[in-house]
From Swiss-Prot:
Annotated EC: 1.3.8.9
Record's protein name: Very long-chain specific acyl-CoA dehydrogenase, mitochondrial
Location, primary (coarse class): mitochondrion
Family the UniProt entry places it in: Belongs to the acyl-CoA dehydrogenase family.
Record PTM: S-nitrosylation at Cys-238 in liver improves catalytic efficiency.
Gene for this chain: Acadvl
Biological source species: Mus musculus (Mouse)
Residues carrying Phosphoserine: 518, 523
Residues where N6-succinyllysine is found: 72, 128, 196, 240, 269, 277, 279, 332, 373, 483, 557, 640
Molecular function as annotated in GO: acyl-CoA dehydrogenase activity; flavin adenine dinucleotide binding; identical protein binding; long-chain fatty acyl-CoA dehydrogenase activity; very-long-chain fatty acyl-CoA dehydrogenase activity
Residue sites binding FAD per the record: 215-224, 250-252, 465-467, 563
Length: 656
């Protein structure tokens, strides 16, 4: 596991990029190796903006500036104590009649293919996807789901894509990773940044499956710290090509791909100073260029059917026209590629959970113990109910995000990170409980649950390790709140010119701190039958925002070092966003009279009751509990002693 530390320069790069993509095109969940750009968001990712500018004069604070569009992100708003509902209410429905019909025509054949042709157990045993399966997927168009139709793809929207990702996730995560590594990250850069010539040259080949693609970022010396990449691409004196040298590790499809998105350092001369600096540039590299080789497939715990290997570049001549994006903009390209595929994992794992729950229910329905079917026992009932709730939340997040992207919203990076954290942890819990319900049978190889458990484990690591993504969620949210606090500080320099702003903020804080509440409400937004859960969500938002502000005021820019605190703020944010998402979906079901509406109401209410309790207790302890501060100090001291001792400090109680 990589360290959460990052250099200040990388943190500032992320701030300049805004940690978001300006494009909303996303494809099937793509699984990079166990590192990701999201790991880059740790530690100092918000330091620059949480610093109040020292040189800002009172005149400057009131100077007219170009208006910045107010974010419509619910997640951004909740850190500020705002109820921003544009992206979450009502639950979005974005497919046109034509898109819905096309999707229906795809769902049947894809589902039948995975039921009748693909053999996940055999793929796992062979440690490769069978050739017949790959050929069948090519014929289905599965290698170019979001490539424009005029370039040989299916041209699917994000929501259409999510539905197919769910089907793949129900059946075989090894195949899912193979497809995702190809199109979600492998050639995604060409979709996002490719020139007309690059798109016309490469997209038809990758869409047909004639050529597989891979994403080459990670190196032995660079995990979280992309700036430490050693691969180099030196321009030729004539300027017609670059000579690429270096190696990449843990590359999905590395041994199969013919087209690679590769990141390497290039020397760039500063026009102003004449100094030469190394900056990362992205390239489209073909195996046919020569000098591209790969190692043996890695032996892995799970997703064995997917190919993972090292890739080597030895004196590869890359034409200058194969630069992806601008020279020196490789960091931006990498971040945006990775940020654009996050929702698909939620859709995929929603499907995985659906299949696991079906196995658990089947076993509970038919298994008799102590003279009764085990589904009649309270312990089993609670397990099944919790599994269903986790799947419902995950599925609701997946289709909320895909719809937001299809609607053209740009600000969803916190929500996307939340969905990745939630779905990967929920899927692990569901798989674990499925085995528990099935007992010894679940531990056996034949039912296939043990394979799914092995496959699921990686999802908490790649696409951004969840520990690091939690820091990103908290820091990104605090960054936006920090900007607001800086604005209030500037307003105080000219109080008579900002009376309305200051009075409004003072009133809001007073209401929160006296327990009256902010006056926010979801009344008239959520369905009346969900009004109690809506009130719980608003109360939770008030409690959460109060703590965020208090901790920012206390720690200021130093909050980037308070990882114990940040993790718990992130947990609150995850719970709160999940509450709002299921409130939105269940409200739609009740309003439109869906047959499952009352069942969805129970799922929603159950989640909201427990999530609100967690938020209330966690925020209260962060706000005033000396025991928590003692706990954090103990964690530091225990860990330090273990590192100094090379392991456990305590000995065996027998003393032998």
């Amino acid at each position: 596991m990589q360290s959460a530390r990052m250099t200040p320069s990388v943190g500032r790069q992320l701030l300049r990029l805004g940690a978001r993509s300006s494009r909303s095109t996303t494809v099937l969940q793509g699984q990079p190796r166990p590192i990701s750009a999201q790991r880059l968001y740790a530690r100092e990712a918000t330091q620059a903006v949480l610093d109040k500018p020292e040189t800002l004069s009172s005149d400057a604070s009131t100077r007219e500036k170009p208006a910045r569009a107010e974010s419509k992100s619910f997640a951004v708003g909740m850190f500020k104590g705002q109820l921003t509902i544009d992206q979450v209410f009502p639950y979005p429905s974005v497919l046109s009649e034509e898109q819905a019909q096309f999707l229906k025509e795809l769902v049947g054949p894809v589902a039948r293919f995975f039921e009748e042709v693909n053999d996940p157990a055999k793929n796992d045993a062979l440690e490769k996807v069978e050739d017949d399966t790959l050929q069948g997927l090519k014929e289905l168009g599965a290698f170019g789901l979001q490539v424009p139709s005029e370039l040989g793809g299916l041209g699917l929207s994000n929501t259409q894509y999510a539905r197919l990702a769910e089907i793949v996730g129900m059946h075989d995560l090894g195949v899912s990773v193979t497809l995702g590594a190809h199109q979600s990250i492998g050639f995604k850069g060409i979709l996002l940044y490719g020139t007309k010539a690059q798109r016309e040259k490469y997209l038809p080949r990758v869409a047909s499956g004639q050529a597989l693609a891979a994403f080459c970022l990670t190196e032995p010396s660079s995990g979280s710290d992309v700036a430490s990449i050693r691969s180099s691409a030196i321009p030729s004196p004539c300027g017609k090509y670059y000579t690429l040298n270096g190696s990449k590790i843990w590359i999905s499809n590395g041994g199969l791909a013919d087209i690679f998105t590769v990141f390497a350092k290039t020397p760039i001369k500063d026009a102003a100073t004449g100094a030469v600096k190394e900056k990362i540039t992205a390239f489209v590299v073909e195996r046919s260029f020569g000098g591209v080789t790969h190692g043996l497939p890695e032996k892995k715990m799970g997703i064995k059917a997917s190919n993972t290997s090292e890739v080597y570049f030895d004196g590869v001549k890359v034409p200058s026209e194969n630069v992806l994006g601008e020279v020196g903009d490789g960091f931006k390209v990498a971040v945006n590629i990775l940020n654009n595929g996050r929702f698909g994992m939620a859709a995929t794992l929603a499907g995985t959970m659906k299949s696991l729950i079906a196995k658990a229910v089947d076993h509970a329905t038919n298994r008799t113990q102590f003279g009764d079917k085990i589904h009649n026992f309270g312990v089993i009932q609670e397990k099944l109910a919790r599994m269903a709730i986790l799947q419902y939340v995950t599925e609701s997040m997946a289709y909320m995000l895909s719809a937001n992207m299809d609607q053209g919203f740009k600000d969803f990076q916190i929500e996307a990170a939340i969905s990745k954290i939630f779905c990967s942890e929920a899927a692990w819990k569901v798989a674990d409980e499925c085995i528990q319900i099935m007992g010894g049978m679940g531990f056996m190889k034949e039912p296939g649950v043990e394979r799914v458990l092995r496959d699921i484990r990686i999802f908490r690591i790649f696409e951004g390790a969840n520990d690091i993504l939690r820091l990103f969620v908290a820091l990104q949210g605090c960054m936006d709140k920090g900007k607001e606090l800086t604005g209030l500080g500037n307003a105080l320099k000219n109080p008579f010119g900002n009376v309305g702003l200051l009075m409004g903020e003072a009133g809001k804080q007073l209401r929160r701190r006296t327990g009256i509440g902010s006056g926010l409400s979801l009344s008239g937004i959520v369905h009346p039958e969900l009004s109690r859960s809506g009130e719980l969500a608003v109360q939770a938002l008030d409690q959460f925002a109060t703590v965020v502000e208090a901790k920012l005021v206390k720690h200021k820019k130093g909050i980037v070092n308070e990882q114990f605190l940040l993790q718990r703020l992130a947990d609150g944010a995850i719970d709160l966003y999940a509450m709002v998402v299921v409130l939105s979906r269940a409200s739609r079901s009740l309003s439109e009279g869906y047959p499952t509406a009352q069942h969805e109401k129970m799922l929603c209410d159950s989640w909201c009751i427990e999530a609100a309790t967690r938020i209330r207790e966690n925020m209260a302890s962060l706000q005033s509990s000396p025991q928590h501060q003692e706990l954090f100090r103990n964690f530091r001291s225990i860990s330090k002693a273990m590192v100094e001792n090379g392991g456990l400090v305590t000995g065996n109680p027998l003393g032998i």
